[in-house]
UniProtKB/Swiss-Prot annotation:
Gene3D superfamilies recorded: 3.90.950.10
Cofactor(s) needed for function: a divalent metal cation
GO biological process entries: nucleotide metabolic process
Alphabetically ordered keywords of this record: Cytoplasm, Hydrolase, Nucleotide metabolism
Record's protein name: dTTP/UTP pyrophosphatase
Catalytic activity, reaction form: dTTP + H2O = dTMP + diphosphate + H(+); UTP + H2O = UMP + diphosphate + H(+)
GO molecular function: dTTP diphosphatase activity; UTP diphosphatase activity
Length: 231
């Protein structure tokens, strides 16, 4: 069964590659702005579902334009589509930390995480897609990808920061690493110097809880095989 990772994150691509899985990559663009007072679980569940819908729509556009026929992996069926979203969550359990929009936003996040423990949450959704015929008029049909099954998991990891000084924050921002990362830091990069300890999955903090994601893929693959056998 073919796997498509719908993510522009190089960190998620690298992690999934470590499992020696063959997969195709597509990028999706959605509005990731949290709703007012939206709780962390509600936010990341909404994000991975929205990314899956956007990816399915993109695949159908490619199929209609015959672009998909240039890629063998998009011709097999069914497909497992993986979407993921990572956020930081402050000790209040309510405040969502996404990618900082600017220096001031990053400083505000870091000041709240300094010398304390926050959580990193990652939601992963596995969506099973299958080709079906859609009637375009009374006589004609066209193939479309349809969502036939989906499952989500959420992994949480506790991360404790040392006390941060203004100079540390300034130097880190100027280095360019924080801008595209939830919570404004990368534990796999220079941000590791701020982490005194973690409790839970390290790869979850990087952006994809690898062991849990592989278990999810296996579960979805087995389910799809059973469905095909029953059919």
């Amino acid at each position: 069964m073919d796997i498509i990772l719908a993510s522009g994150s190089p960190r998620r691509r690298e992690l999934l590659s470590r499992a020696q899985l063959e997969f195709t990559i597509i990028s999706v663009d959605i509005d990731e702005t949290p709703y007012q007072d939206e709780l962390p679980k509600d936010y990341i569940v909404r994000m991975v579902a929205a990314k899956a819908e956007a990816a399915a729509t993109q695949l159908n556009i490619q199929l209609k334009n015959n672009e998909a026929h240039s890629s063998k992996s998009l011709l097999s069926q069914p497909i497992i589509l993986l979407t993921s979203d990572t956020i930081g969550v402050l000790p209040d359990g309510k405040t969502v930390l996404i990618k900082p929009s600017n220096r001031e936003d990053a400083y505000h996040m870091w000041q709240q995480m300094s010398d304390s423990t926050h959580e990193v949450w990652t939601a992963v959704q596995a969506t099973q897609l299958s080709l079906h015929s859609k009637h375009t008029d009374e006589f004609d049909t066209e193939p479309v990808w349809q969502i036939i099954n989906q499952k989500q998991i959420i992994e949480r990891t506790e991360v404790t920061f040392i006390a941060l000084t203004p100079e540390m924050m300034s130097d880190y921002w100027d280095g360019g690493e924080p801008a595209d990362k939830a919570g404004g830091y990368g534990i796999q990069g220079l941000g590791a110097a701020w982490v005194s300890r973690i409790n839970g999955s390290y790869t979850n903090v990087v952006g994809l809880p690898l062991a849990q994601t592989l278990a999810l893929i296996k579960e979805m693959t087995n389910t799809a095989m059973l469905e095909n056998f029953d059919a």
